[in-house]
Amino acid sequence: MHFDHVAVRVGNIQAAVNWYRSLFEATVIYQDENWSLLSVGDTKVALVLEDSHPPHFALRVNSQEELLEPAEHRDGSLYNYIVDPWGNTVELIYYPSEKN
């Protein structure tokens, strides 16, 4: 298991992408109307609209069996959101088509 990405809420996807690109030289990995995944150095940052995804950090797991009741993202990755006792959201994510 290792760190995969952090997701932060934004009010406007394109404005946020432009800001992260200009300030941090981020590159877009994926983007649609609800969210964008950026590469910032060795880190991935997901920009999410306020009502589309919870703010969270994601841990990449090594097998589907490590997920609790997995759901499927549009890109084919499998995930599960869990909430710690203090209200923080953690995403466990597995990429079936890649080595984790």
Question: At which residue positions do the language-model features occur?
Answer:
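Short glycine-enriched loop/turn motifs at secondary-structure junctions
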Residues: 1-2, 50-54, 74
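Core segments of cupin and vicinal oxygen chelate
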Residues: 1, 7-45
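Vicinal oxygen chelate
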Residues: 68-100
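Conserved short beta-strand elements that form part of the metal-binding/catalytic scaffold
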Residues: 27-61, 89-96
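A short, structure-level motif marking secondary-structure boundaries and short turns
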Residues: 1-3, 68-69
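Short secondary-structure junctions
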Residues: 24-30, 67-74
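Short, conserved charged micro-motifs
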Residues: 15-18, 64-69
